[in-house]
Amino acid sequence: MRSDMIKKGDHQAPARSLLHATGALKSPTDMNKPFVAICNSYIDIVPGHVHLRELADIAKEAIREAGAIPFEFNTIGVDDGIAMGHIGMRYSLPSREIIADAAETVINAHWFDGVFYIPNCDKITPGMILAAMRTNVPAIFCSGGPMKAGLSAHGKALTLSSMFEAVGAFKKGSISKEEFLDMEQNACPTCGSCAGMFTANSMNCLMEVLGLALPYNGTALAVSDQRREMIRQAAFKLVENIKNDLKPRDIVTREAIDDAFALDMAMGGSTNTVLHTLAIANEAGIDYDLERINAIAKRTPYLSKIAPSSSYSMHDVHEAGGVPAIINELMKKDGTLHPDRITVTGKTLRENNEGKEIKNFDVIHPLDAPYDAQGGLSILFGNIAPKGAVIKVGGVDPSIKTFTGKAICFNSHDEAVEAIDNRTVRAGHVVVIRYEGPKGGPGMPEMLAPTSSIVGRGLGKDVALITDGRFSGATRGIAVGHISPEAASGGPIALIEDGDEITIDLTNRTLNVNQPEDVLARRRESLTPFKAKVKTGYLARYTALVTSANTGGVMQVPENLI
């Protein structure tokens, strides 16, 4: 066993003394059992994580029952909804790397035989997956689960995105103070990840198709008995996989990454999943070309439209058959998925999901009646984004295939929000927000406030927004993010000027500023080099090492040190 490194031999008697002092070893034979880390992310200020201590206790009991010894440790967590719109958002994406580094440190320092990961919200899930790829120790994931959708006094379904859009509607005068407060009190009624197809739930669904989690991981409610039983079953399966030496990199292959993007297309998932899945591929040693994503989109139908793109919540998806029903439907179309891959269950993706039929065709559409014949995400290329940009086409009004407008440029998120709120931004504008990428932000902050304000003011079809920053999973409208290279790295988005005509073509997947190359070249000559916004602490180190979004926004060691 891997853990023999710390518990076998006379020279490890001091280590064994310390292990006895933990109280985790209940009998002399326990030293001969596998040591399993429980990588938890319990934290009081994140509603998606407040119940994870209870889930970890269930996992511990089941791991012992299965014949192994559990040791729990915790990672940090950032709630993107609470960190939104201020300096806190600069720490959100960088927290993913801290989580991966922290988990790697504990796992490798103590030579665990397996790891039970309990994530739930936005950056915690991908951070833990990065750790699993990096350490490549037998592992299983069981998330905390989504919260129930809220309900307004008028019987309208609510999610967190409803609240962000309500801010714009309240400022406009479209809703009363009483309606506004009612929504605030009822939008998030239970613990769990936010109820729509936002980043957290997108990633928790993708773990099913990647093969790292059990079926229904992405949709079973946080407060359900099914979630607790899933924890138990996952613990049993992990101990079995330790014995069989089934490792994360055996499961997460190039084909698994393809299938993750296919499910994302079918469910209209968050654009952040592109960023995180590319980072996962990078950590797994897979060189993944962004062009593959468009090829996947072309062959993958859009089957389930979930909040914020509709009123359906994750619980509605669960009741309609969950991710297994969507996977089963996609498997009926040859070439859409790679169903004979091994998964954490020890069975193939096909064996896990075959026969799981759709129970509600309003929530999950069948192959012969999709929302769209193509997937809900697109990668755009052009002279603004030579290395790619991402748009959630599932969140764009279906009548819009192209949008051409005049650029109105901002070098920060806050400047853009102020201009939207004071009505400087008008119909026909393309809002350009730059120097908000991984390096420029730093931390690639989410642009939910500006996009929500645009939609809340009734301009969702009349104003576009492009940025080297990223979006919340709750974002909808004509919103293009992840523009690469970013402005801070000298990307062409830095060359756009007010009044430039910009065309977003969703049919041909292009993003261009309609200026001659010689004009852009002259502008580049006078471009001021980027200077880091943060000079000390973690964000300064992050700025120095992070890459643009096309590689997942990962931190890379300088080539001269390799």
Curated annotation (Swiss-Prot):
Cellular component terms (Gene Ontology): cytosol
Pathway stated in the Swiss-Prot or TrEMBL entry: Amino-acid biosynthesis; L-isoleucine biosynthesis; L-isoleucine from 2-oxobutanoate: step 3/4; Amino-acid biosynthesis; L-valine biosynthesis; L-valine from pyruvate: step 3/4
Gene3D superfamilies for the chain: IlvD/EDD C-terminal domain-like
Pfam families for the chain: ILV_EDD_C (PF24877), ILVD_EDD_N (PF00920)
Cofactor(s) essential for the protein: [2Fe-2S] cluster; Mg(2+)
Cofactor: binding details: Binds 1 [2Fe-2S] cluster per subunit. This cluster acts as a Lewis acid cofactor.
Family statement: Belongs to the IlvD/Edd family.
Protein name: Dihydroxy-acid dehydratase
Native source species: Staphylococcus aureus (strain bovine RF122 / ET3-1)
